[in-house]
A protein has these predicted regions:
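Phosphate/diphosphate-binding glycine-rich loops and adjacent basic-rich segments that engage nucleotide
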Residues: 199-221
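N-terminal amphipathic, basic helical "cap/leader" segment at the start of enzyme domains
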Residues: 1-108, 215-221
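Generic beta-strand structural signal
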Residues: 95-97, 156, 184-186
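Short, cationic motifs built from Arg/Lys/His that form the positively charged side of catalytic pockets
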Residues: 9-13, 151, 202-204
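A glycine-rich helix N-cap at a beta->alpha junction
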Residues: 70-77, 176-202
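Short, flexible, mixed-charge acidic loops at enzyme active sites
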Residues: 64-65, 111-122
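A short secondary-structure junction signal
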Residues: 110-114, 165, 199-200
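Small-aliphatic-rich amphipathic alpha-helix that forms the alpha element of a beta-alpha
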Residues: 29, 33-34, 99, 105, ...
Length: 221
């Protein structure tokens, strides 16, 4: 059952840097996730740049995300507060595989190309200005795909976590991914966890760290 799969999900603190999945294992996980999700008109107007095992680069990525987090706090008027490392980001430093999800330009498949030609419609996903107007839709679809990847990874005995604290400046990403064309939507890591975030919480913090209720999230009307 899907519940049993996702009950294993925990936010990673540190990945095991010795027990590293092979690229073939990761490719298998990514391949299995594709048919488990969906996209409007099968556009899949997104891609993930997969950064493989490289501890030096992973540490630089953590440093860059921490710097962005500190800068963001400064913009919120908290520049005088001390900068404390965020344990929620630590998984970036040891992740053997890091997926940088971004939008991508894409042409329609043969089926939808014929349909758009027949009705003289305009395909929106193959030019930058139209694509960026669809960022919300693309972000939702990335979320669906990345969650399926997490599920397959969990079923494979691995772990996966997410990060939303990073720079939105495209130029900041060129040193990591020279060919990147759009700012990231989300960062996802995959590997074998060595420790989890919940393990560093005090008993009081664990009690306070609650999920919203069903009443908070759903309203029957």
């Amino acid at each position: 059952m899907i519940e049993n799969t996702f009950k294993k999900r925990k936010h990673v603190l540190h990945y095991d840097t010795k027990d590293i999945p092979t690229q073939e294992q990761i490719t298998d996980i990514l391949s299995k996730a594709i048919p488990l999700t969906t996209s409007k008109q099968k556009a899949f107007a997104f891609k993930a740049f997969v950064l493989g095992p490289d501890l030096a680069r992973s540490n630089k990525l953590l440093t860059a995300c921490e710097a962005s987090n500190t800068e963001m706090n400064g913009k919120l008027g908290e520049r005088n507060l001390p900068s404390n490392p965020n344990p929620g980001l630590y998984h970036l430093a040891t992740a053997p595989y890091t997926l940088i999800w971004t939008p991508r330009l894409v042409n329609p498949n043969t089926h939808y190309k014929k349909k758009f030609m027949k009705k003289k419609g305009a395909w929106e996903m193959n030019n930058s200005s139209s694509l960026l107007k669809c960022e919300t839709q693309i972000a939702i679809e990335i979320g669906m795909m990345s969650k399926m990847i997490m599920g397959v990874a969990l079923d494979s005995g691995l772990d996966s976590s997410f990060c939303l604290c990073y720079s939105r400046k495209l130029s900041d990403w060129k040193p990591f991914i020279p060919q990147i064309e759009f700012s990231p939507t989300i960062i996802q890591t995959i590997g074998k966890a060595k420790s989890y975030y919940w393990e560093i919480l005090t008993p009081e913090e664990s009690i306070d760290n609650t999920n919203p209720t069903i009443e908070d999230l759903f309203k029957f009307v």
